[in-house]
């Protein structure tokens, strides 16, 4: 048995056996490289197979302030030696200064038979962080300082909680004793008196000293003066600029420890200039925001950016340029390379949410600054944890949308092209349903899709408004918007009025298009009308005789064209006039690519549909419904300015996608979105013979049987005919409707069924560690975020020794 160093007492003593020698060397290197404990005297003590314990060894143990026991299999064997165990029991007492590190040995109640105070030892494991090892040693040394025994506030055998389960202590002060240090910043070359206030009573009969330990120069001890039982004053020595460790000694015991800083005049000027050049304060002063308020500035900048963005938004150009490969090469040698980094640093939450909807947002998100930090880590570094969470969830939601589309549409040879197109078509869904639910232009342009009866007048007014209003960013005037809302709300009620007016003609089969009376006046020439919209079916009794003075609207539209081309290869115009009324068979799709999220209505669309149903049922009239909708829009606009409101909407969208994925996994189906039949005004239409617009006779198939189409069935196993595959896709697209099963996914009153945890996609590691130490590179460093280099270099810990029997 031997101890390295002179056995006259030490601060840290490491006890080990030969099988834990590598761990002993690692801890020595760790403690010597740590600024917090490297000034302490460190010795090691080896217990070999034939070890003996002398009185000199026992004296060394008793004079040590912290004993680190590397509990390995060979060391445990010494506990079974009757001659050695009593000496070890005395050496490992009192328990508050003993720290055990389990090296290949599990904790067991058997050790209580050897050491009654076993439960009071601090316990560490091989998986703990290096900072935990240092903090545990600091805790043992601090408790051995004697302050607790002076005040007698705690019993000596008080249980010490395992430090591996506690949070790391801050690097500024030692726990318990220090209260205040004034001043904590000292100008180089100036004579300054430092006052230290502690919690424990000091004995003025014992010599009190202060030790100043710069990082790059030897330590300096100065005699301190005890002003009273709790206050010490000391003259600060003249040191170079930088951080200096300050320790207060009462005799040979360390009372407290803290860190102060020395600065030069030029460094102070630099600090003043950096504070004066704070961009947030500068902008608050420029915009006359007094007192300085970051939230007010955030709203002002957000509104300014919104006013300079087109009304329909920039999301049309897409935002999914997330760099997924070789992200470390996408690093800039700047502190704030993009506006997104700037908004994240200063906590401009609303501006950040708006920037995420702009083109290139995710590309900017994947750019690291000169320190290797990304916008989300920058936000957390400066204390904006809610903003960090919002950015992470937004990026995850975009990735979820892309993955969901990819799973649904990537089938066959055209998978790549379809996926790229769908990725761009569905990016605006994220903004409409989560970040900007009250987008007027998207709302008005989509009204016609829900009320085919009012599409003609709506199309005409929209065209007139767009041609007569050249102001950019204002596609429709307020009068036009009010008129469109009124016509939308009157859609079903007008249809009911026409039915009541024509009750005398029961049994009459009307055309699917509007019929125009001869005495009605039209302000727009029929030849200049836009294309005929989807017809509106009416519920009338079949077999009725049609009035001779009513002429189908379709004939007026194609009147001039039929004169220029008198005959048609399939059927003549006379047969169309004299034949029975027909319902067109839609062979052409409405869009070239199917969007699985097309049926997901925005909050504004749902509100309009709700008011329309109330008007139809007579609960409110049209004027009241218009006022209710305007009030809802105003309230929605005020709420949308709230960052919390945007967080809630984003969470609803995420929960909707997550719920669909979970339902898909439970059911085992290939897809979770079903294509339904378009909504009709009457849900109970009788089965009728179908006619084509250009066909003289009925089709053989009356109404095709309703089958549930799944995207797994879009392409069958038969690939011999290209036409069959094309027809299959065409027939699928022809069943597009405004209700594809996603209407209730983003309701305001929706209760999320799934709480999704944060995925590890975005970089989650902040570049600023809580301590100045870094974990030894036992695990390869993460590629997404690199820690800045520090002055301390640690070696990886050795492997864990094999477990004993």
Curated annotation (Swiss-Prot):
Comp. bias regions, Low complexity: 717-740
Recorded topology in the membrane: Peripheral membrane protein
Record's keyword annotation contains Secreted: no
Sites bearing Phosphotyrosine, chain numbering: 263, 419, 444, 459, 513, 553, 570, 594, 694
Coiled coil residues, start to end: 645-667
Region spans: Necessary and sufficient to mediate inhibition of NF-kappa-B downstream of activated TLRs: 10-144
Stretches with biased composition (Pro residues): 795-805
Subunit relationships: Homooligomer. Interacts (phosphorylated on tyrosine residues within YXXM motifs) with PIK3R1 (via SH2 domain); required for BCR- and TLR-mediated activation of phosphoinositide 3-kinase. Interacts (via polyproline C-terminal region) with ABI1 (via SH3 domain); the interaction promotes phosphorylation of PIK3AP1 by ABL1. May interact with MYD88 and TIRAP.
PANTHER family assigned to the protein according to its UniProt record, in alphabetical order: BANK1/PIK3AP1 FAMILY MEMBER, PHOSPHOINOSITIDE 3-KINASE ADAPTER PROTEIN 1
Recorded domain comment: The DBB domain is required for dimerization.
Protein's recorded name: Phosphoinositide 3-kinase adapter protein 1
Annotated source species: Homo sapiens (Human)
Native organism taxonomy: Eukaryota, Metazoa, Chordata, Craniata, Vertebrata
